[in-house]
Regions:
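Class I SAM-dependent methyltransferase Rossmann-like catalytic core
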Residues: 1-33
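Short, glycine-/aromatic-enriched active-site segment of Class I SAM-dependent methyltransferases
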Residues: 132-150
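A short glycine-rich, Lys/Arg-flanked "PGG" loop and its adjoining helix->strand segment in the class I
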Residues: 112-127
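Short glycine-enriched, charge-decorated loop/helix-capping segments at active-site entrances
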Residues: 14, 77-78, 144-148
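Class I SAM-dependent methyltransferase SAM/SAH-binding core
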Residues: 34-88
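A short acidic, Gly/Pro-enriched loop at the edge of an enzyme's catalytic core
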Residues: 87-99
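A short SAM/SAH-binding and catalytic strip from SAM-dependent methyltransferases
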Residues: 97-110
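Conserved small/polar residues in nucleotide/adenosyl-binding loops
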Residues: 171-173
């Protein structure tokens, strides 16, 4: 079951949420240091992590699952959020260069169809980052943060899911 987008926005407006956003953004930027000319999609509730790409990528969008609801983003510009079913993504085949999944994979009831759709829209040389609660992590054991909801994953579970979905797993952080 998805966490409501309004509740996620409230979390990321708190002190803990702001620290979380900074730490995750830093990791993402380490992996994706150059996104000039690329099309980037944030899937789930990924908007807290997309702002740095607005000035360099050709296109930055956010897709929020209908079950999660949506919020306007960015607050200081034209809306870049699309709402869709998580297993029927409204994008052409091979149209996304970089895709980040946050607050979605652990909540969906359609995991394998969702991964199949991500595979379909991601370019052959595209890159995917998945942010999920760690099965061994402290945050997966408390419901004080959004990372305490849904299905946590171990590294081996993620590797197996991605391999079964025809993805090549390169990095675990």
């Amino acid at each position: 079951m998805y966490i409501d987008a309004v509740d996620l926005a409230k979390f990321y407006s708190t002190g803990l949420g702001q620290v979380t956003r900074r730490l995750i953004r830093r990791k993402i930027r380490t992996i994706w240091s150059n996104t000039n000319g690329l099309t980037i999609l944030g899937f789930g509730y990924a908007t807290p992590f997309l702002r740095p790409f607005l000035t360099e990528a050709d296109n930055v969008m956010a897709l929020m699952p209908a079950q999660q609801g949506g919020t306007y983003w960015p607050v200081d510009g034209l809306n870049r959020v699309v709402i869709s079913e998580d297993d029927e993504l409204p994008f052409q085949d091979s149209s996304i260069d970089r895709l980040i999944v946050v607050h979605s994979m652990e909540c969906t009831e359609h995991l394998r169809p969702m991964l199949k759709e991500i595979w379909r829209i991601l370019r052959g040389d595209g890159r995917l980052i998945i942010v999920v609660p760690s099965r061994s992590g402290v945050w997966a054991r408390t419901d004080r943060t959004p990372f305490g909801f849904g299905q946590p994953y171990s590294s081996s579970q993620l590797t197996r899911l991605l391999r079964d979905g025809m993805f090549l797993s390169l990095i675990h952080i």
